């Protein structure tokens, strides 16, 4: 492992955040001698970010922990176009009202990760709509457009991939990388920003911003990207068969959020503890070394630590208590998904769909046929099975890790 002089790059390296850097030696030297403002952009494509964005949010947290200044850039302007990087087709355009509502909803998450204020290392949040919405087309083309080579833009993997597949890339989308580059230059002027960070898919956009800032202002700025994060089975972070694992409390119950982390593959436990918690590295090494059924204790620690960070102490405690009641004591935790039944009975298929364990009746039937459905711990293999609902709560399970409650309405 490379030895760095700055606490910032040492921290990022030790915890596995670094994929690529521009001029690592110069960035290391700068970070060792002064406070660096650094930013990451988040486009408001939904009312909540999901777990797939957590590496970037944690990267801003690490920046602040190392004594530097995080800048959260909300893409109120670029969100009107949509980032085409490595997408097979154009994003659906959102109205201005939807974008504004999404920005307002997303903002609250960052307060759990970062300290905001007016101090030299306090985080700030800005919106690129503040400058992009004011651009005039002809002056922008003359001042900024001259610094971009279309030939080079076509060579970036994110663009080349679409063209090689003969998939349409609109002029609107093609302009996204220019606007993102302009963001870096604008933040350099407004906030003395010297660093842009992002996922590995943003490398081309980051390099464009570095070059634009150098050409227009003669300022040296830097870029860092994180590795593409997938689970051990090759799945993308933040998505499950049931949908996205949202960060906002109103988008996903704390129990489901906690359970996502508790279900982590054994092979991912150490990596996720380093990336998504503040636990000391020696403690992570101890947890990562656990084998057999003991690794489950490390998964509970992971679930508790991440849920505490994202949802708060009480949510983490409640989720763990629900898990203990459900799995250890055979009881029913209070935070499990619940379905109120108005009739005296309900079919197993309808119960599975109603509890969110299957997206459709067909999927529920396949789950039953495959032996994945249980009622109060007993397997159900008949898709026509009816569950009698009385004053007693009934546990319905999908596989070993998903549990819900049926209650009389």
UniProtKB/Swiss-Prot annotation:
So what EC number does this one have? 6.1.1.1
Report the main location listed first in the record. cytoplasm
- Where found? Cytoplasm
Q: Which GO terms describe its molecular function?
A: ATP binding; RNA binding; tyrosine-tRNA ligase activity
Question: Keyword set for this entry?
Answer: Aminoacyl-tRNA synthetase, ATP-binding, Cytoplasm, Ligase, Nucleotide-binding, Protein biosynthesis, RNA-binding
Extent of motif 'KMSKS' region: 236-240
Q: Name one GO biological process term.
A: tyrosyl-tRNA aminoacylation
Q: Which NCBIfam families match?
A: tyrS
Oligomeric form and interacting partners? Homodimer.
Q: Which family does it belong to?
A: Belongs to the class-I aminoacyl-tRNA synthetase family. TyrS type 1 subfamily.
Q: What does this protein do?
A: Catalyzes the attachment of tyrosine to tRNA(Tyr) in a two-step reaction: tyrosine is first activated by ATP to form Tyr-AMP and then transferred to the acceptor end of tRNA(Tyr).
Kindly provide the name given to this protein in its UniProt entry: Tyrosine--tRNA ligase
Organism of derivation: Novosphingobium aromaticivorans (strain ATCC 700278 / DSM 12444 / CCUG 56034 / CIP 105152 / NBRC 16084 / F199)
Supply the source organism's classification: Bacteria, Pseudomonadati, Pseudomonadota, Alphaproteobacteria, Sphingomonadales
Q: What gene does this protein come from?
A: tyrS
């Amino acid at each position: 492992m490379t030895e760095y002089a700055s606490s910032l790059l040492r921290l990022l390296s030790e915890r596995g955040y670094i994929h690529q850097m521009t001029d690592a030696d110069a960035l290391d030297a700068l970070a060792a001698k002064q406070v660096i403002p650094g930013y990451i952009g988040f486009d408001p494509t939904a009312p909540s970010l999901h777990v797939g964005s957590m590496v970037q949010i944690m990267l801003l947290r690490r920046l602040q922990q190392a004594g530097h200044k995080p800048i959260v850039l909300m893409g109120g302007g670029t969100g009107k176009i949509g980032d085409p990087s490595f997408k097979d087709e154009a994003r659906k355009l959102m109205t201005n009202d939807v974008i504004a509502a999404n920005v307002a909803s997303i903002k609250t998450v960052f307060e759990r990760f970062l300290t905001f204020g007016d101090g030299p290392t306090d985080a700030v949040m800005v919106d690129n709509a503040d400058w992009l919405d004011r651009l005039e087309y002809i002056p922008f083309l003359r001042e900024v457009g001259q610094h971009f080579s279309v030939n080079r833009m076509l060579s970036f993997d994110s663009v080349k991939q679409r063209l090689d597949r003969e998939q349409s890339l609109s002029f609107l989308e093609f302009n996204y990388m220019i606007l993102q580059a302009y963001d870096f230059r604008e933040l350099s002027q407004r906030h003395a920003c010297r660093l842009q960070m992002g996922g590995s898919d943003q490398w081309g956009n980051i390099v464009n911003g570095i070059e634009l800032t150098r050409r227009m202002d003669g300022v040296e700025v830097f870029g860092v990207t994180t590795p593409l994060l997938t689970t051990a089975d090759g799945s993308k972070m933040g998505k499950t068969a049931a949908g996205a694992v949202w960060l906002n409390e109103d988008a996903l119950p704390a129990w489901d959020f906690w359970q996502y982390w508790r279900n982590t593959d054994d092979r991912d436990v150490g990596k996720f503890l380093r990336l998504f918690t503040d636990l000391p590295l020696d403690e992570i090494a101890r947890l990562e070394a656990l084998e057999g059924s003991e690794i489950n204790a490390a998964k509970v620690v992971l679930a508790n630590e991440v849920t505490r960070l994202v949802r708060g102490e009480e949510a983490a405690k409640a989720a763990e208590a629900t898990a203990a009641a459900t799995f250890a004591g055979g009881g029913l935790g209070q935070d499990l998904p619940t379905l109120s039944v108005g009739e005296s009975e309900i079919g197993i298929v309808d119960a599975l769909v109603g509890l969110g364990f299957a997206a459709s009746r067909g999927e529920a039937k396949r789950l039953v046929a495959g032996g994945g459905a249980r009622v109060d711990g007993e397997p159900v293999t008949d898709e026509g099975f009816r569950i009698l609902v009385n004053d007693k709560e009934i546990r319905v399970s999908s596989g070993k890790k998903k549990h819900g409650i049926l209650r009389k309405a």
